[in-house]
Each structure stands twice: as structure tokens, then as C-alpha cells.
């Protein structure tokens, strides 16, 4: 898990420095995350524990922007936390990220990097409404080790790469301590 965390740090640093550089390398790191950050099983109680982990990591990182955290398992919202200062706009972004992850079975950040590399957008390539789908960081597939997707983990409120990496770090910590 240490290696995936180190790669996550590299991903965040690189993207924050220049979001248009090394898009393929960044996409490959996200693919590694999506393959490594899988669960042997996941219960509703586990989702609560995962939500608490992200809450604690958010506090420890001392971010100043308010966020909304959302974990959906098998189509059922099992964890939702909105910080003071967040707004319904954050929930709208979560819905768009959720739709992207649910339909395309990959993180919304990965979708955004793919679209940037191809010089297109989701509406142009997949004929989906822009107001319903979002190709930006903060939506991550919850998958079992078998590869079956059972849910979606979303964060909205930070810069897109920070939303994405906060999710990855939270799952990595959960897997290290709980499974």
C-alpha cells in the first residue's frame, strides 16, 4: 500500500504543478490506484468507517475549502457528510461524478484525463448531457477484488485532484487498517 500512496502523492504534486503535463503518466497512476484499491468485502458499517477516515484525513490536511463526502453502495447512499460552508452545488457535482463512475466503471478523474488526451469532451464523445456527467476528479469506483463494482465514493469541494487523492488515501488507509 505504501507504493500506491507514494504514487498518489506524485500524482497530486504533478497535477497541481501543471495539469496539462504528463497526462498519460497520470492516467496510468490512476489505473494502478483503481486496481490496487479494491475490497475483499464491504459492509454499510465499513462505509461508515471509511467516511470517518476521510473526515479525519481532511481535518489532518487542514484544507480550508468545505467539502461534501458521499459513499454509495449498491445504489444506496450509506454515508453522506456536508461541511459547514458547502452548498447544494457540491451535491450537484457529486451526482455528476457518480453518474460518470457508475456508467463508465472508472474514476471521474481518469475520464477527465482521457478526454483531455483525446481533445474532446464526454458530451461530444459519448453523447451524454454535460449537466448530468462530470469528467473531473472526485468520483472513484468501489470495487471488490474480483473487479465487480459495488459502489461509488465521491468528494466535492477541493481542487479536482485533491478530491481524487483524498479518496485514494482514505481507501488505502482503510485497507491497511481494516482488511
From Swiss-Prot:
One of its GO terms (cellular component) is TRC complex. GO terms for biological process: endoplasmic reticulum membrane organization; post-translational protein targeting to endoplasmic reticulum membrane. Gene3D superfamilies: Haem-degrading domain. InterPro entries: PduO/GlcC-like (IPR005624), PduO/GlcC-like_sf (IPR038084), YBR137W-like (IPR010371). Disulfide bonds: none annotated. Belongs to the UPF0303 family. This is UPF0303 protein P4H10.12. It comes from Schizosaccharomyces pombe (strain 972 / ATCC 24843) (Fission yeast).
Amino acid at each position: 500500500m505504501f507504493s500506491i500512496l507514494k504514487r498518489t502523492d506524485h500524482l497530486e504534486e504533478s497535477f497541481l504543478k501543471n495539469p496539462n503535463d504528463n497526462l498519460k503518466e497520470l492516467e496510468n497512476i490512476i489505473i494502478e490506484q483503481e486496481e490496487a484499491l479494491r475490497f475483499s468485502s464491504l459492509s454499510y458499517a465499513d462505509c461508515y468507517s471509511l467516511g470517518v477516515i476521510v473526515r479525519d484525513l481532511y481535518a489532518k490536511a487542514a484544507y480550508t475549502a468545505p467539502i461534501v463526502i458521499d459513499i454509495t453502495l449498491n445504489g444506496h447512499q450509506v454515508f453522506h457528510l456536508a461541511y459547514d460552508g458547502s452548498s447544494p452545488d457540491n451535491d450537484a457535482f457529486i451526482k455528476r461524478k457518480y453518474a460518470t463512475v457508475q456508467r463508465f466503471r472508472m474514476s471521474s478523474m481518469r475520464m477527465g484525463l482521457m478526454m483531455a488526451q483525446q481533445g474532446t469532451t464526454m458530451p461530444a464523445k459519448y453523447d451524454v448531457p454535460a449537466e448530468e456527467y462530470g469528467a473531473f476528479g472526485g468520483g472513484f469506483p468501489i470495487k471488490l477484488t474480483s473487479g465487480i463494482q459495488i459502489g461509488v465514493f465521491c468528494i466535492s469541494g477541493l481542487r479536482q485532484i485533491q478530491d481524487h487523492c483524498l479518496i485514494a488515501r482514505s481507501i488505502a488507509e482503510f485497507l491497511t487498517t481494516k482488511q
